Amino acid sequence: MVEKAVECFNNQSYPNKELILVTDESNIYLEKLKTFVCDNIKLVEVPKGSVIGKLRNISVDNANGEYIATWDDDDISFKDRLAEQYKFIIESNKEVCYLTNALIKDNIANVVALSRKGLCIDCTMLAFKKTFPRYNDEAKYPNVEDVPVKKHYIKKRQVAWLNKPHLYLYNIHQENSCAYTIQKNWIDIII
């Protein structure tokens, strides 16, 4: 999966980008991850057992840019995702941009769908780093790290909602943290 994530990153039309790969030292793919390191791809190794919120905080701490974006290794960010979101967040004068909907692929049911508008896929976030809150990194909430971040921005009315579902494909598979199949209330149309 990480090969596709790195390929999507390298294919982004936005020129000034950096990818932070965070993994624990027990990762069986550690040697493979090291092969991706270059001028704009950094690898950070952490102790085994860190929850995803902690891993994401580490990636934010290691990022050099003025803006940060979530980059999941199992999803596909199409080539203009960063450029379109960056342009929109600047034009909107907001602190964060989420896509209002996305393409969703259920790899178990072998179905591709267009999510309903307003679903807001959390992993499509692009945010101004200076005002970014910390991810939830408590072990008792290992898979809901994105929710408090999104609620923080919604409460502040600082969200730029971009309706361009063709920029992102959310993959559903048996290792997802939140759902293992498309939920009926998630979709508008099955493609």
Which residues does each predicted region cover?
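Short, acidic, metal-binding catalytic loop of nucleotide-sugar glycosyltransferases
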Residues: 7-16
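Short beta-strand/loop segment that forms part of the nucleotide-sugar
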Residues: 16-26, 42-46
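A conserved acidic beta->alpha catalytic loop
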Residues: 23-32, 72
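Glycine-rich, basic loop-to-helix element that forms the pyrophosphate-binding segment
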Residues: 46-63
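Short aromatic/hydrophobic "clamp" motif used to bind/position activated sugar donors
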Residues: 68
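Conserved donor NDP-sugar-binding/catalytic core segment of glycosyltransferases
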Residues: 82-111
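Catalytic beta-strand/loop signature of glycosyltransferases that borders the donor
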Residues: 100, 160-167
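Acidic donor-binding loop at a coil-to-helix junction in glycosyltransferase catalytic cores
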Residues: 142-149
